[in-house]
């Protein structure tokens, strides 16, 4: 069986499933590898799916079922198994591998991954986080279009090496239809898929992709509120730490995996100690991306001080 070699989010991956969006490598060392393969789920899992159960989590094993797409089993921080449904949408099947499955792998490995896009600014990584619909991908796309380099679209995988670093993801972004229209992208030339009843498009960002880790300097949380103009405020102390924890990718599942252990919590503290955290509040139903970028460039880029 021919395997595809990838390096994504700091993970060495050998995959039976070809994922075109990932950067392919000729060779990869065999130790500490994540394998991705097609498989057949156990009778126990199949029985639970028949009973209507769609996800099951334990310390070292997570499986979940997506109707008409596939069943996925993620185990021991090093294995992803996929059983396809009949006539499955292969593009959507791979999206779950790229996002949720690798997110669960990182949780099992106690790697802190923050839900957000990552842009290189002033030679450092800046994470843009926030709730769904806050405008993360729109803002990171606008920054990329302005010439800033790009590390990751939706997941910021971190590593502590005295200070926190963000590991590169893959050189594509997922954009909704309105963002495609705002940036004048050709929808016909992009792969599309349906996610939560919304059409998403996969946009090539290879020309601005950064393939090496970058030191993390800022996290910016985007918030939509009933306000008239874009404002910015800094979070400090425990509020900063709490917001990091609240925005962990797939963090809602940590309590089902034995809770947050001391090592994982210490990584969150180390991130908080070494970065600044800002909240940008923007009005709903207005396209304020240019204003947000102006504010970020004027107020935040080049700021050296870290306030704990």
What is the predicted role of each segment?
Residues 109-123:
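Phosphate-binding P-loop
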Residues 139-140:
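Post-Walker A alpha-helix
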Residues 1-89, 93, 294-308:
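Long, basic/Gly/Ser/Thr-rich N-terminal segments
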Residues 2-24, 122, 126-129, 146-151, ...:
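Glycine-rich, often acidic-flanked micro-motifs
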Residues 95-112:
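N-terminal pre-Walker A segment at the start of P-loop NTPase domains
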Residues 143:
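Aromatic pocket-lining residues of Rossmann-like dinucleotide-binding sites
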Residues 133:
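Walker A (P-loop) phosphate-binding loop of P-loop NTPases
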Residues 136:
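Conserved lysine of the Walker
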